[in-house]
Swiss-Prot record:
The gene is dexB. One of its GO terms (molecular function) is glucan 1,6-alpha-glucosidase activity. The keyword Cytoplasm applies. The active site is at residues 194, 236. Belongs to the glycosyl hydrolase 13 family. Keywords: Cytoplasm, Glycosidase, Hydrolase. This is Glucan 1,6-alpha-glucosidase. One of its GO terms (biological process) is oligosaccharide catabolic process. It catalyses: Hydrolysis of (1->6)-alpha-D-glucosidic linkages in (1->6)-alpha-D-glucans and derived oligosaccharides.
């Protein structure tokens, strides 16, 4: 396998609205990110994935783009973007841009022209039909919106302000490739591709994900844009199996560097239920099965995976699967150790490295997220009690990840000097903040720093094979074999003591959140114990 820089990289996702505000308007901005690069350099990350900062009416917080080659005023301007790129590159940090090309904003010049002039070339940049079919929007309701002026319907798999692009139109594809090359020329390190598995859709057959021409489009995109540059690409692919992931990321296929697979995320809700019908606790045996499948079936050289617990669309893993009260620090370290010692490129979402938690939303006035608000409206119309709706939003709503970054004990957690922030700051910022984390050598931050450094330094993390070890249900233990070297990772994914009887005598500790000798002596794991050891030959 040809080694690439991203095999040893750890990537840090920034949600710009919530990272750091320097303008005093209560919303994070590009200058705020630049001001905190030294912090990220200390953490040790290789690259930042930047959620969208393009010009946008912000119907879906920037995932509705009205101009791909301009910066949203709320975040700054192109000079600020250039400054961020230069300052990051000086520190050896790459910037990965979010590429949102399944749809645009309805305020994009192409759609404005398409709507105003049904005979324009731009009309065919989007998907119009005389009659709607049964396709549903991911944000609830029909995926078709009537344009009263022409009497036709346009397709929007997300909000009605996010019309889907017609990827069958070669002119659209070329315009997208030109835009991608504009950003590559600026020196970015790659693209994270939003819902990229939807671009091959065939609406008339009600096929949305993994359409028949999807891989043709990606091969064409690769050749026309990033294929000749040392940049990384990761596709958001909700429906991916290991077999599909191989198609995307097998090097000789010349498509993407890696994918995000979301199979484990499905464990956040009850089987075959919507996300709002959340599971009360993590099914650890199911998690073991899913992670082990991806570790063993996406073989080295055949494709590449990403590793993540959190992103801007998901609740905080600490609150949904960890223990965000008495074992907050320990369970955060345990979940990090469990994930980061697998094969793949790990992604950290802002605040994860200090153990940020879900927000205690009281009522809908505190909620901003379009998906949560649509769910609340629909659920309450169907008789779901308001208390149950709020319980679901508190547990799995997207705003949990989007509350402002907690920098210090200062007002608004040091995020902003505004009177009010765009989303409320979690009241636990007095206990959970960057300043305290940096001052405490035993904090979650330093466990993440250690894991990031290990990945840069240790070839086995990239190349060793993976084998799940038989254990109690709530213990996740796996072994990685690299030539003569054997590494064993053991994590108690529970609040209860667990038996662990494997003989690891004489093993060398690589990383831990507990007293490994005591575990091996007593053959018991305390709640959320986690460690990695190298076995003696």
């Amino acid at each position: 396998m040809q080694k690439q820089w991203w095999h040893k990289a750890t990537i840090y996702q920034i949600y710009p609205r919530s990272f750091k505000d320097t303008s005093g308007n209560g919303i994070g901005d590009l200058k705020g990110i630049t001001s905190q690069l030294d912090y990220l350099q200390k953490l040790g990350i290789t690259a930042i994935w930047l959620s969208p900062v393009y010009q946008s009416p912000m119907d879906d917080n920037g995932y509705d783009i009205s101009d791909y080659e301009a910066i949203a005023e709320v975040f700054g301007n192109m000079d600020d973007m250039d400054d961020l790129l230069a300052a990051a590159n000086e520190r050896g940090i790459k910037i990965i841009m979010d590429l949102v090309v399944n749809h645009t904003s309805d305020e994009h010049a192409w759609f404005v022209e398409a709507r105003e002039n049904p005979n324009s070339p731009e009309r065919d940049y989007y998907i119009w039909r005389d009659e709607p079919n049964n396709l549903m929007s991911i944000f609830s309701g029909s995926a078709w919106e009537l344009d009263e002026a022409s009497g036709q319907y346009y397709l929007h798999l997300f909000s009605k302000k996010q019309p889907d692009l017609n990827w069958e139109n070669a002119h659209v594809r070329q315009k997208i490739y030109d835009m991608m090359n504009f950003w590559i020329a600026k020196g970015i390190g790659g693209f994270r591709m939003d819902v990229i598995d939807l671009i091959g859709k065939i609406p008339d057959s009600e096929i949305t994900g993994n359409g028949p021409r999807l891989h043709d489009y990606l091969k064409e995109m690769n050749q026309a844009t990033f294929g000749n540059h040392d940049v990384m690409t990761v596709g958001e692919t909700w429906g991916a199996t290991p077999e599909i992931a191989r198609q995307y990321s097998r090097p000789e296929n010349k498509e993407l560097s890696m994918v995000f697979q979301f199979e484990h995320v499905g464990l956040q809700h009850k089987p075959n239920a919507p996300k709002w019908d959340y599971a009360e606790e993590l099914d650890v045996p199911a998690l073991k099965t899913i992670f082990s499948k991806w570790q063993t079936e996406l073989k080295l050289g055949e494709g590449w995976n990403s590793l993540f617990w959190n992103n801007h669309d998901l609740p905080r893993v600490l609150s949904i699967w960890g223990n965000d009260s008495i074992y907050r620090e320990k369970s955060a370290k345990a979940l990090a150790i469990l994930l980061h010692l697998m094969r793949g490129t790990p992604y950290i979402y802002q605040g994860e490295e200090i153990g940020m938690t879900n927000y205690p939303f009281k009522d809908l006035t505190e909620v901003d997220d379009i998906e949560s608000l649509n769910y609340a409206k629909e659920a309450m119309e169907n008789g779901v009690p308001a208390a149950r709706v709020m319980s679901s939003i508190r547990k799995v709503g997207r705003d949990n990840a989007r509350t402002p970054m907690q920098w210090s004990k200062d007002t608004h957690a040091g995020f902003s000097e505004a009177q009010e922030t765009w989303l409320p700051v979690n009241p636990n910022y007095q206990e959970i903040n960057v300043a305290d984390a940096l001052a405490n050598q035993d904090s979650i931050f330093y466990t993440y720093q250690q894991l990031i450094a290990l990945r840069k330094d240790q070839d086995w993390l990239v190349e060793a094979d993976y084998h799940l070890l038989p254990t109690a249900d709530k213990v996740f233990a796996y072994q990685r074999q690299f030539g003569e070297e054997t590494y064993v990772i053991v994590v108690n994914v529970s609040d209860q003591e667990q038996v662990f009887a494997k003989d690891l005598a004489g093993a060398e500790v690589v990383i831990t959140n507990t007293d490994v000798d005591k575990v091996l002596e007593t053959k018991h794991l305390q709640p959320w114990d986690a460690f990695c050891v190298k076995l003696s030959v």
